[in-house]
Amino acid sequence: MKSIEDELRSALHEAAIEHFGDGTEIEGLVKLSGGASRETWSFDAAIPDGGRLPLILKRDPPSDEVTDGPTGVASVLGVDRWTEGRLLELAGEVGVPVPRVHFFLAADPRTTAGFVMQRLEGETLGRRILREDAYAEARP
């Protein structure tokens, strides 16, 4: 029986080949901590031209109690993963600085619905941003 990571890697690999081309490989897949209403996974796509794309997968958490549709489970805010990813795309189209959404994953037996976007470096912990001197310029 395949692990959750193996199943997810398989689904990501197929979608990445469809999006980036034959020869694309998924490397360094790791689940990140945090995320109360969805999972966040970090990985790189090694693409056929020799480049590497740092990426993030945001997906619904697996659950035996919840049946999600192809676009995902609505969160407490009422937004499924497809809508969340699409909102990021639309925000980017009007000049809001957001990560680029590369592709969407539909729910299937290997994974829940989600989307893959550009991975950006930076701090994500609010406590650090609010208290550490290194982020003083970012605070009002």
For each feature predicted by the language model, list its residue ranges.
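ATP-binding pocket architecture of kinase catalytic cores
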Residues: 30-140
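Juxta-kinase regulatory segment immediately upstream of eukaryotic protein kinase catalytic domains
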Residues: 1-25, 29
